[in-house]
A protein has these predicted regions:
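N-terminal ordered "arm"
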Residues: 3-65
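Extended, highly charged accessory segments
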Residues: 53, 64-350
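Catalytic cores of nucleic-acid ligases and guanylyltransferases
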Residues: 2-3, 327
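Hydrophobic alpha-helical segments, principally membrane-spanning helices and signal/leader peptides
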Residues: 1-2, 289
Length: 350
């Protein structure tokens, strides 16, 4: 398995929808984010009558023998509420045993830098222990605790005039894996991810509140040694019925890595083809796959100074996107303009 190829695709899915054009926190589009792979607490899903998922299931076929092992990795974003506080009185240092007196504000300009309330994200991944084909089932619960931190904001006189308050809510997920025999040396592998985070009074809560207790952009990476996964898109004829019986919920697995190798499955909330790749013309994450890279880049280049000022204040990822675009050489922009590529072969066009 070429880990770099798989991780490039996985990271593109992980941050799809993280920030949408026009890349400003104040835009309407960015008040409704993270529609891919969001698993809400079970109680909130029930309150929303299933319109918000709490469960993701991957099913695929694995061929192997007594020497075959496989690994299960779940990756997602954990949202962090970022609030901005303005101190009532400037301080030299933050107190160590309590919080200073402050009030929350939507934005705060400190030393020419804009700080604004937002939802940041932390990358998370959890793994089951390496399994073999003798294991009928494996279940593991993962818990991430609630945390709250304060980051001081200093003015040009080195006085603390504000704080960034970051609050991460508790998340509890259960990952289970089941193996069943399809035929000699062929097995059905079922991996379920469930959000079992306690979430009281769910019927009165907003989606934004629920997202803080959710796994976002959730996806599964399956890898095997001494075994082979079967393509669900183009299975061999003798396994077509077994593939059709696979039930995938809120996700779909495809072969990933070097084309032709069958040791990795990437199960994504965004439907992909086998062996997905990042285009050579791509210069980095734009977070908005619903748009064309060239058009997004040109739009960023034409933002006003005020719009760029707000964009820089979102977070480091968005600031890096702006800086990368502003410094992009003309030849890189021309590469995005167009390229002739051959069609991938499949059973349908051979």
């Amino acid at each position: 398995m070429n880990l770099e190829l798989v991780e490039n695709i996985a990271n593109a899915v992980l941050y799809e929808g993280y920030m949408l054009y026009p890349y400003r926190a104040s835009s309407v589009k960015n008040r409704q984010r993270f529609n891919w792979g969001a698993l809400a607490p079970e109680s909130y899903s029930a309150a929303q009558k299933g319109t918000e998922a709490c469960l993701m299931q991957t099913e695929c076929l694995l061929q192997g023998d007594e020497n075959t092992t496989f690994d299960v990795k779940i990756r997602f974003l954990h949202l962090v509420l970022r609030e901005i506080g303005e101190l009532e009185t400037p301080l030299d240092e933050l107190p160590t045993d309590s919080e200073p007196e402050f009030h929350f504000v939507p934005t705060l300009d400190v030393g020419g830098q804009l700080y604004q309330a937002w939802q940041e994200a932390i990358e998370r991944e959890v793994d089951l222990p390496t399994l073999d084909l003798n294991v009928v089932s494996e279940t593991k619960k993962f818990s991430i605790p609630t945390t709250r931190t304060l980051e001081p904001l200093r003015d040009e006189n080195d006085k603390i005039v504000g704080v960034i308050v970051r609050t991460q809510q508790k998340i509890e997920i259960v990952v289970s894996c089941q193996l069943s025999v399809v035929s000699e040396k062929t097995y059905k592998l079922t991996v379920r991810v469930e959000n079992q985070t306690p979430f009281e009074n769910a019927e009165t809560k907003t989606r934004e509140e629920a997202l803080l207790h959710s796994t976002v952009s959730t996806h599964t990476i399956l890898s095997t040694k001494n075994g082979e996964f079967i393509s669900l898109l183009e299975p061999p004829d003798e396994l077509s019925e077994a593939v059709a019986a696979c039930e995938n919920i809120k996700t779909y697995p495809v072969l990933a890595g070097i084309e032709g190798e069958k040791d990795c499955m990437f199960s994504s909330p965004i439907i992909l083809y086998d062996y997905p790749q990042i285009a050579d013309e791509s210069q980095g994450d734009l977070f908005d796959g619903g748009e064309i890279d060239e058009i997004l880049t040109l739009r960023i280049m034409t933002l006003t100074d005020e719009e760029k000022y707000e964009m820089r204040g979102v977070d480091d990822r968005v600031r890096q996107l702006l800086e990368r675009t502003e410094s992009m050489p003309e030849e890189h922009l021309m590469k995005m303009h167009g390229a002739m590529k051959g069609a991938a072969k499949s059973k349908g066009n051979e």
